[in-house]
């Protein structure tokens, strides 16, 4: 009986440890996903690049996206 209780407690502890590790390992954000509130979560080959939004010369917001490192994006007219 004591062995069953001990085994149950050990299994419970192992399951809790695995759940805690899974919560800490957040999946990375793929290319073009919004990273405004999570700038460090882009996948390793990407960088969180932010752009300001302006209206009448005043900044009204900011957008951030996971983009390829070293790539320059230009606006097309």
UniProtKB/Swiss-Prot annotation:
PTM section of the record: Contains 4 disulfide bonds.
This protein's UniProt keywords: Disulfide bond, Secreted, Signal, Toxin
Subcellular location: Secreted
Propeptide: 21-26
Leader sequence residues: 1-20
Free-text tissue specificity from the UniProt record: Expressed by the venom gland.
GO cellular component, one term: extracellular region
Superkingdom of origin: Eukaryota
Similarity annotation: Belongs to the neurotoxin 19 (CSTX) family. 08 (U8-Lctx) subfamily.
Protein name: U8-lycotoxin-Ls1m
